[in-house]
């Protein structure tokens, strides 16, 4: 599969998100299947409510994750974050 072209801004966003281990782990846990907020929080283990909300809100605001029908899903950029595309 060929790597899609990204502009400088996309590279910077991806680098910033990937530089935070919790954000990368969140993307990996969401994966391709989708997951609820509660399931994600449980799978992450010992993460404070503030840290969880802050980092998940960041991933949503930056376009790595979308929430649809009560489940979190990765966007194309989110897949790149989770799997190093």
UniProtKB/Swiss-Prot annotation:
InterPro entries: WH-like_DNA-bd_sf (IPR036388), WH_DNA-bd_sf (IPR036390)
Family classification: To A.fulgidus AF_0255 and AF_1363.
Protein name: Uncharacterized protein AF_1348
Organism: Archaeoglobus fulgidus (strain ATCC 49558 / DSM 4304 / JCM 9628 / NBRC 100126 / VC-16)
Stored Gene3D superfamilies: Winged helix-like DNA-binding domain superfamily/Winged helix DNA-binding domain
């Amino acid at each position: 599969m060929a790597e899609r072209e990204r502009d400088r801004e996309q590279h910077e966003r991806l680098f910033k998100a990937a530089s935070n281990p919790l954000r990368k782990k969140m993307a990996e846990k969401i994966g391709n299947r989708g997951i609820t907020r509660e399931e994600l929080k449980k799978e992450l283990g010992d993460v404070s409510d503030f840290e969880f909300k802050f980092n998940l809100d960041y991933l949503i605001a930056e376009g790595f994750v979308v929430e649809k029908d009560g489940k979190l899903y990765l966007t194309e950029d989110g897949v790149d974050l989770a799997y190093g595309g």
